[in-house]
């Protein structure tokens, strides 16, 4: 299948490599012309995983976004949610009937891309799919090398609009066999693991993160008090899902930490792979890193807004959001991605359900 991968980050390189090795005709698009030329000159991406190190050559590497979009049946956008608004405008007029666009994870970016297309006058029947995590535990070690320490085994995925679920699922499953269909894109957004795992890890490790040059939040930074906080925060996420009427499995993050529980998104050994790999011993800025700007400011703010919409009390969600706001000197409830900022908070439950199913 013709697949395009949009972006040049960790997950983008991993996707380009993985999907090429699965036999798809992959185009990798990235904006940075200098880094793009370096890749084009080399023609291959180096990958290091459990199978060893090797070179993989995507079919095409380009900075032509129109060409990348128009040639593909499936477009994968494994970029931080902080890129969504600008990218949605850039691509709004390019989508074509029958395409499936995969946002792993989405933070309800599916609606942002769909609305941008409609605002640009594009009425193409496109499906925007989103899931709860990247399909890869991956880190770029240099311009040409990506290390992949784990591959997702379960990707609960919702479609926008949900009326296209059967068609989109059948197409996307050819690219990612690990996807599992769920109710709709909002259900997919509420599977997002980033705000649950990263928010306590960075806020409760703020001291060592700012003191040491590098700190591993998944090893030394994961202690019993932080795990207890993560479980309590996840309980609020699951309560939000249940209040919206979404069914189990809710993929509780506790499954990620305990191989004896149900299989989580990265399988039963996902956390052990994080422990074994020191690629996550990083310099994490609490004002610029995506764990704050994507997972807290956008992702946790979105959860908070869903709780407000449902009139559901989520004190830990709001408390952690307030701490992130204090560190950064701005109110994440105002600056973040919320149902209010998306113009959806005035819809009643029936109207929201219809929007999720039918689109605009």
Residue ranges, per PLM feature:
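An accessory alpha-helical subdomain
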Residues: 183-190, 208-222, 246-247, 252-257
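NAD(P)-dependent Rossmann-like dehydrogenase/reductase catalytic/cofactor-binding core
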Residues: 227-360
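Short acidic low-complexity segments
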Residues: 52-71
């Amino acid at each position: 299948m013709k697949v395009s991968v949009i972006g040049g980050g960790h997950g983008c390189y991993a996707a380009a490599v993985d999907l090429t090795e699965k036999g798809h005709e992959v185009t990798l698009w990235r904006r940075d012309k200098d880094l793009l030329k370096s890749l084009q000159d080399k023609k291959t991406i180096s990958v290091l995983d459990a199978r060893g190190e090797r070179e993989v050559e995507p079919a095409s590497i380009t900075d032509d976004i129109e060409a990348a979009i128009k040639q593909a049946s499936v477009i994968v956008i494994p970029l931080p949610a902080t890129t969504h608004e600008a990218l949605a405008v850039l691509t709004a007029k390019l989508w074509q009937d029958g395409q499936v666009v995969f946002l792993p994870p989405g933070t309800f970016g599916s609606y942002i891309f769909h609305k941008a297309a409609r605002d640009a006058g594009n009425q193409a029947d496109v499906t925007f799919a989103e899931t709860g995590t990247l399909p890869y535990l991956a880190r770029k070690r240099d311009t040409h090398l990506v290390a992949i320490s784990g591959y997702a085994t379960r990707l609960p995925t919702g479609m926008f609009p949900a009326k296209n679920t059967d068609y989109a699922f059948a197409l996307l499953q050819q690219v990612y066999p690990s996807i599992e269909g769920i109710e709709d894109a909002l259900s997919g957004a509420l599977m997002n693991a980033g705000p649950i795992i990263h928010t306590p890890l960075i806020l409760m490790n703020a001291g060592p993160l700012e003191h040491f040059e590098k700190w591993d939040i998944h090893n030394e930074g994961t202690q019993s008090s932080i795990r207890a906080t993560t479980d309590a925060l996840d309980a609020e996420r699951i309560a939000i899902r249940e209040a919206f009427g979404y069914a189990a499995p809710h993929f509780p993050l506790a499954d990620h930490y305990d191989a004896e529980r149900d299989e989580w998104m990265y399988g039963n050994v996902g956390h052990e792979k994080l422990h074994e790999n020191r690629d996550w011993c990083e310099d994490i800025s609490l004002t610029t890193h995506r764990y704050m700007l994507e997972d807290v400011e956008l992702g946790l703010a979105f959860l908070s807004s869903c709780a407000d919409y449902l009139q559901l009390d989520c004190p830990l969600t709001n408390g952690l959001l307030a701490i992130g706001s204090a560190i950064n000197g701005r109110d994440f409830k105002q600056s973040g991605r919320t149902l209010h900022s998306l113009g959806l908070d005035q819809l009643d439950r029936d109207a929201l359900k219809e929007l999720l199913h039918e689109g605009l």
